A protein has these predicted regions:
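Face-selective signature of the C-terminal outer-membrane beta-barrel domain
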Residues: 320-338, 367-403, 411-553, 561-564, ...
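Structural motif
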Residues: 25-36
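Short, acidic Ser/Thr/Gly-rich low-complexity loop/linker segments typical of extracellular
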Residues: 47-60
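A short, solvent-exposed loop/turn motif at the edges and junctions
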Residues: 44-48, 70-85
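Membrane-proximal, glycine/serine-rich, low-complexity loop/turn segments characteristic
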Residues: 20, 33, 58-60, 81, ...
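Conserved C-terminal beta-signal and adjacent last beta-strands/turns
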Residues: 719-742, 752-851
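Outer-membrane beta-barrel translocator domains and adjoining extracellular loop/strand segments
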Residues: 206-207, 271-277, 341-358, 399-408, ...
């Protein structure tokens, strides 16, 4: 309760502080009365800068400053004479400017466009100002831009926040599958990358507040006047023969965009990554897939192409076409086939009051996944209404073989999973009189008609089968009333979900080891929301009143919840923004709560549940701060979050010999998490250098049960990730990225900690315009036990020759022929040590043609 009061007081103080600020606003026009966008307006007092901003596309601006005395308001804009006025303390804060055109006689000079420009909520990067000769794809270019981070998976973030939209010339061709574009579009086709803050996908929402951010890619004329493409072929040898071939054909016209791609090869795994939807919620995974995901889910914290031997194929066709002025139709289709195999050894040290239980195993997972998918969308997006209907579907066919040696005993495991997902998403918004109406209905059907796991060992065999279906619908009707700075939302939400789940476990001596479940859930929620919005300040309060009903068999259980949320967004100045939110939420029941008979997950692991609905409540408080000076290319973001979780079920693990039983005990418990993150980026333009420092800290406390003993535990994790990307002169490029971490765990009278360090460095030298020589190294030092450390160094060399539209490269990977990688993890009270086999030395030749 004290935490809630503290958060409310903090927000109240913030509002009070805002009230003490005076608004200075006005309009900047030229001598003909036309608005002047992009003018820099600055407020000073006694040579102290109180704040600054830029004028929008209508020439308007607004500043919030503390006026203790006279304030000088000045305006500067390229091509116009500077102007300033003095606002006395007791005068109005309205200040309009009429600028005179400035005529300057210039000597002969080379004029360069600025690397970065800001106009209102749009930040535009000139890509050519950041890229180097070695940057080939759009993804390579995005990694160079200050303030933008691209994760290894391809996910894009701006100032620490995931993007909510990805556009090419203003058109949403790919949705969340933007990996297809960032991996396929050559950087040479891109003029600029725009970051769209306060992003709203619907034009009807243009006057509403949003803290979403999106990316818009602006192409050069070469990419827009004719079909373009990129084609690549590679061949090489390592532990086996290596090959790859890929091609992308692209068309970007004013009304039509098309990207078609075909990739095949066994050098890198790519098929499943290209189909990843970064805008889709991970909670959409069905119960059957969650049960099937534990067989070969272990992956180390390193690039997959260092240890996985893949064989992938992917084909995609994506097209969007404008129909009339406001409407578009879009189709996205693809097929992915991914095969992979790798090997690793694992040692688990499980806590037991009589001494640690140690389990050791070696395994070689081999998996093949085939995934066809299709999406069709119609959208109308005008100032008066927004309509969108999306039909989507995909199928998964997965086969896995996982031989394992457990404590010296060999076993074989094979897995087969077939699944399909289909859905229809409809949404519409329109204005009528003074109300903005909104209707949405999302329906989804998922089926996994056949999942099987077969295990054979010297003790006999076990077969586990699972099948399931899920039908869900999410329906919302809402009205929004607006008056000046006030908005009242009145939404009514009705969601339903029905799960069918059937399991059967057979083997020597096993009888009655099955579950036959049907669980239905309905949620009715009335969620009134009030929003007070100014140009630089938004306060939002929401009080959802919710009723849940759960049916299992002939029994029905009802729940009633009130889940308030308070949100504040305050733009302190043109440079900095603060966001805070406090919320209470509740998550009730999952079909896996009712697994009263064990389900075999893998050779050693069983899963079971108490047979009653889980009930988890969350108190979440978070604060975000970002600071940016685009012209000086400084970007800073910081986040702090606290999460308290009340649960009615306690995780329980029983470890004995070569088996693990995951269960939950009916025991109320509480866990706490504190998460802090910071990111700082500075672009040093004269030497074309990007310097970044990212850091994170995690503290968690909770309770768990193992082998019948209840224990409290606490853990800490601190990670620092510095990076430098420098192109100081035309013939030299230097890159460095590091990861320094310390993890600790404490339970009972036991305290453990381990350190990890990794460094990646590369140098590229271009002695002549068309030739690039490169060398790169990865060095890691991992602590495995209290006194045991393992150091590993990987070394790569490369040669690139460019001539007109051709790029030829020769790469030597893992030149030192390193064959293993080890690391240690702490999971509450248990310790796990892994050792992965690496791919050996490889030589690869690649030819790329861009047209």
């Amino acid at each position: 309760m004290r935490r809630i009061v503290t958060c409310v007081i903090f927000i109240a103080v913030s509002v009070a502080a805002l009230a003490q600020q005076d608004a200075i606003k006005g309009c900047v026009k030229d001598s003909d009365g036309n608005p002047v966008p992009g003018a820099i307006i600055k407020a000073t007092s006694s040579s102290t800068i109180l704040g600054y901003t830029t004028s929008d596309d209508k020439g308007q601006y607004s500043l919030s400053v503390e006026r203790k005395g006279d304030v000088v308001v000045s305006v500067d804009c390229l091509g116009y004479e500077s102007s300033s006025v003095i606002l006395h303390k007791d005068t109005s804060g309205t200040c309009d400017f009429s600028l005179k055109e400035k005529r300057i006689g210039l000597k002969e000079a080379v004029v360069r466009a600025p690397a970065i420009r800001q106009l209102g909520d749009t930040l535009s990067y000139a890509v050519s100002a950041y890229t180097t000769r070695s940057d080939y794809t759009l993804k390579d270019a995005l990694k160079r831009l200050p303030g933008i981070d691209v994760e290894e998976s391809g996910r894009i973030k701006y100032l620490g926040k995931d993007i909510s939209g990805f556009y090419i010339e203003g058109m949403n061709l790919l949705g969340g599958k933007y990996n297809i574009a960032t991996s396929g579009i050559p950087a040479a086709y891109v003029n600029s990358v725009q970051v769209l803050s306060n992003h709203k996908e619907a034009a009807i929402d243009r006057n509403t507040f949003s803290d979403d951010v999106a990316i818009n890619v602006k192409l050069n004329d070469k990419a827009k006047i004719k079909p373009v493409g990129s084609y690549e072929a590679s061949a090489g040898y390592g532990d086996r023969w290596l090959y790859s071939a890929k091609g992308s054909a692209m068309l970007f016209r004013a009304k039509t965009q098309v990207i078609a791609s075909l990739d095949v090869g066994n050098i890198k795994g790519f098929a499943l990554d290209e189909g990843t939807d970064f805008l889709k919620s991970e909670s959409d995974v069905t119960a059957v897939k969650r049960l099937a995901g534990g067989l070969s889910a272990s992956h180390p914290p390193m690039k997959a192409d260092r240890y996985i031997s893949p064989s992938d194929m992917a084909v995609t066709v994506n097209a969007i076409h404008k129909v009339g002025k406001y409407s578009t139709i879009k189709v996205n289709a693809g097929y992915s086939s991914a095969r992979s195999d790798y090997s690793y050894s694992f040692k688990g040290q499980y806590y037991d009051e009589d001494g640690e239980i140690v389990m050791s195993q070696t395994t070689t997972p081999r998996t093949k996944t085939q995934r066809p998918w299709l999406s069709l969308e119609y959208q109308k997006n005008s100032d008066k209404c927004f309509i969108r209907e999306t039909l989507h579907g995909n199928m998964d066919f997965t086969r896995s073989a996982v031989p394992v040696e457990l404590n010296g005993e060999m076993s074989s495991q094979s897995q087969s999973l077939n699944s399909m997902d289909f859905g229809s998403d409809f949404s519409a918004r329109w204005r009528r009189d003074k109300l903005l109406w909104s209707v949405s209905s999302d329906m989804a059907y998922s089926a996994s008609p056949s999942y099987s796991l077969n295990i054979s060992s010297g003790d006999g065999g076990i077969s586990q089968s699972v099948s399931g279906e899920v039908f869900s619908s999410e329906n919302t009707v809402s009205a929004v009333w607006e008056k000046r700075h006030n908005r009242i939302y009145i939404p009514l939400i009705f969601n339903t979900q029905t799960d069918w789940l059937k399991t059967d476990r057979t083997g020597d001596g096993l009888t009655g080891e099955g579950n036959d479940l049907r669980v239905s859930k309905a949620v009715l929620s009335f969620s009134p929301q009030y929003e007070y919005s100014l140009r630089d300040f938004v306060l939002r309060a929401e009080v959802p009143v919710r009723g849940d009903a759960i049916w299992r068999g002939g029994d029905m259980t009802e729940y009633f919840s009130v889940c308030p949320e308070l949100y504040l967004n305050w733009r302190l100045s043109a440079r900095s923004t603060v966001r805070t939110a406090v919320s209470y939420s509740r998550n009730i029941s999952d079909v896996l709560d009712f697994l009263t008979r064990p389900v075999q997950i893998d050779r050693t692991t069983l899963q079971i549940a108490p047979g009653t609905a889980s009930d988890s409540k969350y108190l979440t408080a978070n604060a975000h701060y970002d600071f940016k000076i685009p012209l000086s290319q400084w970007f800073v973001n910081a986040d702090l979050a606290y999460v308290r979780n009340w649960r009615n079920q306690l995780p329980s693990v029983t470890v004995s010999g070569g088996s693990i039983l995951n269960d939950r005990a009916l025991a109320p418990n509480v866990s706490d998490n504190i998460i802090a993150q910071i990111g700082v980026t500075k672009q040093i333009a004269p030497i074309k250098t990007k310097v970044s420092l990212n850091g994170s800290y995690l503290h968690n406390e909770g309770r768990t049960m193992q082998n019948g003993q209840v224990m409290d535990y606490a853990g800490n994790s601190l990670v620092l990730s510095p990076s430098v990307s420098s192109h100081p002169v035309g013939w030299l490029e230097l890159n460095y990225s590091g990861n320094l971490s310390r993890t600790s765990s404490r339970y009972e009278d036991v305290a453990k900690s381990y350190d990890s360090r990794s460094h990646e460095m590369s140098i590229r030298v271009s002695p002549v315009q068309s030739l690039i020589l490169s060398a790169a190294t990865e060095n890691t030092r991992k602590q495995l036990t209290d006194d045991v450390f393992k150091t590993m160094t990987l070394l790569d060399f490369g040669l690139i020759w460019k001539h007109k539209a051709w790029k030829l490269s020769l790469d030597l990977r893992n030149a030192l022929d390193q064959r293993s990688y080890s690391y240690t993890l702490y999971d509450s009270i248990n310790t796990f040590t892994y050792e992965y086999a690496l791919r050996g030395r490889e030589v690869i030749f690649t030819a790329v043609l861009t047209i």
